């Protein structure tokens, strides 16, 4: 947990905050750039320091300095770091138990402690989150920014020194970093493994994983040694720091759609052999996505990661589109929650069948009202209406005698008459376009692919090459 580690390292807490250096830049300070720094305490100027004076103050006092220039005393631990350290140690214990039971093949206990350590991670990060929350008792925007900006500098530093390791090992000046996230970096292991084993069979997962873990351990140790320099030179923390990076997983392939939205085919997770899809930020796995479409897009992602030919993926998508008409409505309708139904109700004429909706009413709310109105209109009084805060499903309809564009339903205990009406009037083309095509396009554009087409219904035109006589047409 990078943010909690940053808070503990800098000793960020309301009672340890000393002031803020205006104009602070760690790299300039390390290089000895001549400049004057202004010290502010509670927004008031308390003094000015040149390069030498500031260095003397740092050398003679136990003071840390964050990337945004906030200084903290280090001679005693602050309240927030003490709490975080307790929770942090508990997470370390849970992770050790997770690994122990994982190595022993005890899947249930492994799963329990994996979830437990993840809960602990959320608790740790939540304390950072409230630092920037105005209603929090210890709210301080300087402390919140000190955490995030220092964390950003740490990841940039990690990227820089890891590239240095690769460049030294491989004898080049390339940037090998694939991707950086808030608290992680992604690097290809293949260049290092192939440098050491030129004839290695890269398709041998067992051999590659073994070598990758060895290489990752070397890189991991190199980075962690570099963190000693970062803590001392960038933050003026000369004693213990909490920065520690660890190899997390080995992915056979990965696919980035955009920043923070990607999928990985993982074959080793935390030192344990596996074969699973890991998805971050892609809404294809969200519960608000129709189950059948979720299954399709998950398979498409797996195919992309497995380097399946585009034509084969296209065929699966077009086959799904054709078979939508025979798919259970429950599996292709859009699941969602519906709230504050009455809020969107407008003045409705007495003889109107359907309730008038206010401008800007969300489509799923309109769909829920249509369902309730049909219950009344058709006298289906034995069935419960959709209520606020319920989970529903809804779907687009093609032009029909009732002039209904969309309709919701509960997904259980629904009147057969309404369900039959839905079945007869589903607008499959609109549903595919609105719910699925955008997701497909997002993947295909990232790969620079053309969108899939139905080849069976695409007009193919043959051309005959004609050569004109050289002496003209006359």
Regions found by a protein language model. Name each.
Residues 87-101, 120:
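Non-transmembrane amphipathic alpha-helical segments
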Residues 15, 92, 96, 129-132, ...:
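Non-catalytic alpha-helical coupling and interface elements of nucleotide-dependent molecular machines
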Residues 465-474:
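Single conserved hydrophobic/aromatic residue that forms the stacking wall/gate
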Residues 132-143:
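Gly-rich Lys/Arg/Thr-decorated short loops/hinges at beta-loop-alpha junctions or inter-strand turns
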Residues 183-187:
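A generic structural motif
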